[in-house]
Structures are given as structure tokens and as C-alpha cells.
């Protein structure tokens, strides 16, 4: 898909696309909620696969929403757009035949250096998905205590050397750029061969903390089943164990849901070859029970 000319970098290659379409059990004329529309890739698939269907498209990222508006313009009034964190969305009287959430940071966000999500290019330490919020990664790094930073790195990044990194940050701050932080983290860790960049877990942890991703996910998993019609499907794609654990338990423990996937659906080797960022994707599905059954 080619997004808007204004946002050419917001390319959205939908992961697990066929599994999502089959899992949502699409029907002509159905109404679907894309809770994380991104560049519009999954929404386009839904609109193409289900004639006369409608999509309500959410994203907290204004740039993503602009790209989705452009990409989905041919579908006209079949799509309605709202800038919102999926945890805060109010469905009102609307009930959906299916809901999709594609979690975490998008490839487009990682590929926009000025957003500060990636350590691969120097940029301000921002990491806000919603530019309307005030808290940035720089503010968190420069104001949190060593104990608070260590907890963030350990619980949100599963970083073994969380305390060591946190102490080093406090000793050398203020830090304002991604390059400064990545360099400091690399120097703080013992030299050893690693399969990932030394700063990977720290950047993930800060992004999750700045955007309250896990708290938002838990709220979404609790609230979204109430937005489904009886028999409606909820599909959630996660990309790391912290997300997947919450999705697994959230679907299993909700009184209104019946889990449809004992184990998560994974991308094929062909999809991973075509889109390497799909390699860690996991799809879980559940179906809304009748209110009396729940």
C-alpha cells in the first residue's frame, strides 16, 4: 500500500493478514472497529473482503491517522476516523461485528527518526505516540529516580542490568537525544556478543512507559468485549511477551469471551521473509458470548 503524499513514510504492511480476515469471520455489511488503524493496511483488507462493510478507525497517532485517511479515501463514508487511544474510546450505542488491535510501535513510527522511537538514528528523546500528551522520554529519563528507572527497564524491558543502567543514567544526565542514551547504555553493559543492540530493551521499556501501553492494553481488553455483538470476534496481534501474556489472560479471563485460539497464530516463513518485522507477531482470537452465557 502507498500512503498519502504528505506521509510517504507511513507505509503499513499488515501482518498476519489472511489469518486476521479469516479470524474475524467477516460478513457483508458488517461493522468493524480497527482500534489501531496505523497506515490503514488491515482496514483496507476488511473493506475489500466484506462488501458494504463499514470500519470505525482509531489511532492515537495523528500522523498515522492522516496516512490512513489518504489510503482509505476510495472507500468514502464506509470509514469513520477518530484520534483516540483505544483504551479511552467510547462506543456509545455502536456494536461491532469484529474488533482488531495491532499492538505496539509501527514500522512507520520506527522509520521516522524525528519521533525518537529508534536508536538507529539520532533524534530528540520523544517516543510519544500521541503528540498531544506532555510526557516525553527525555522528561522521564531526566526526572525519574534511579529506582523508578530501574523498575521501568526491568518490568517493561526485561533488562537484566536495569539497576546498572539506571545508575549510569542518573550519573550522566541530562540526556536529550537517542544517540546519547544508546551510547550510554552500550557503555554501561558488560562487553559480550549480543544478538540485539544493547539499547533495545531500554528503548522498548521507555516507549511502553511513556505511552502507558500495558495499562492501556489491559483497559482495552476489559472494555472492548462489551462493544461486540453476540458472536462478534476480537482479534489482537502482539509483538512481545509482555503484551502477549496480557492478551492471553485478558481473553481467557473475560466473562463475555470464548477463546478461539488455544495457541497463538504465527506468521509463516514466507511472510517473515517478505516482512522481517512480522517475525515476532502473535495473533489471538476470541468470540463474544451471549450476555446470558457470560
UniProtKB/Swiss-Prot annotation:
Residues noted as binding S-adenosyl-L-methionine in the record, renumbered to the chain: 40-42, 59, 86, 102, 109
Cellular component, GO, one term: cytoplasm
Keyword terms: Cytoplasm, Methyltransferase, rRNA processing, S-adenosyl-L-methionine, Transferase
Subcellular location: Cytoplasm
UniProt xrefs under InterPro entries: RsmH (IPR002903), SAM-dep_MeTrfase_MraW_recog (IPR023397), SAM-dependent_MTases_sf (IPR029063)
Record GO terms (molecular function): rRNA (cytosine-N4-)-methyltransferase activity
Reaction catalysis annotation: cytidine(1402) in 16S rRNA + S-adenosyl-L-methionine = N(4)-methylcytidine(1402) in 16S rRNA + S-adenosyl-L-homocysteine + H(+)
UniProt record, GO biological process: rRNA base methylation
Function: Specifically methylates the N4 position of cytidine in position 1402 (C1402) of 16S rRNA.
Alphabetical list of HAMAP family matching this protein: 16SrRNA_methyltr_H
Protein name stated in the entry: Ribosomal RNA small subunit methyltransferase H
Gene (name only): rsmH
Amino acid at each position: 500500500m502507498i500512503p498519502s503524499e504528505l506521509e510517504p513514510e507511513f507505509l503499513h504492511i499488515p501482518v498476519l493478514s489472511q489469518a486476521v480476515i479469516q479470524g474475524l469471520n467477516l460478513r457483508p455489511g458488517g461493522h468493524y472497529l480497527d482500534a489501531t488503524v496505523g497506515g490503514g493496511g488491515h482496514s483496507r483488507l476488511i473493506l475489500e473482503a466484506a462488501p458494504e462493510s463499514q470500519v470505525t478507525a482509531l489511532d492515537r497517532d495523528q500522523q498515522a491517522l492522516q496516512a490512513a485517511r489518504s489510503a482509505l479515501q476510495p472507500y468514502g463514508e464506509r470509514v469513520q476516523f477518530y484520534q483516540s487511544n483505544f483504551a479511552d474510546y467510547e462506543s456509545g450505542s455502536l456494536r461491532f461485528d469484529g474488533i482488531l488491535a495491532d499492538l505496539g510501535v509501527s514500522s512507520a513510527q520506527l522509520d521516522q527518526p524525528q519521533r525518537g522511537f529508534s536508536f538507529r538514528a539520532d533524534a530528540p528523546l520523544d517516543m510519544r505516540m500521541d503528540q498531544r500528551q506532555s510526557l516525553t522520554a527525555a522528561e522521564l529519563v531526566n526526572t525519574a529516580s534511579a529506582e523508578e528507572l530501574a523498575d521501568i527497564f526491568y518490568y517493561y524491558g526485561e533488562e537484566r542490568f536495569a539497576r546498572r543502567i539506571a545508575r549510569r543514567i542518573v550519573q550522566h544526565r541530562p540526556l536529550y537525544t537517542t544517540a546519547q542514551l544508546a551510547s550510554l547504555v552500550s557503555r554501561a553493559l558488560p562487553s559480550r556478543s549480543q544478538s540485539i543492540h544493547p539499547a533495545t530493551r531500554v528503548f522498548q521499556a521507555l516507549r511502553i512507559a511513556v505511552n502507558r501501553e500495558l495499562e492501556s492494553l489491559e483497559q482495552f481488553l476489559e472494555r472492548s468485549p462489551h462493544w461486540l455483538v453476540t458472536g462478534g470476534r476480537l482479534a489482537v496481534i502482539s509483538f512481545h511477551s509482555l503484551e502477549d501474556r496480557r492478551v492471553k489472560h485478558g481473553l481467557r479471563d473475560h466473562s463475555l469471551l470464548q477463546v478461539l485460539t488455544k495457541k497463538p497464530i504465527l506468521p509463516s516463513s514466507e511472510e517473515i521473509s517478505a516482512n522481517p518485522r512480522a517475525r515476532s507477531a502473535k495473533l489471538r482470537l476470541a468470540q463474544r458470548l451471549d450476555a446470558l452465557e457470560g
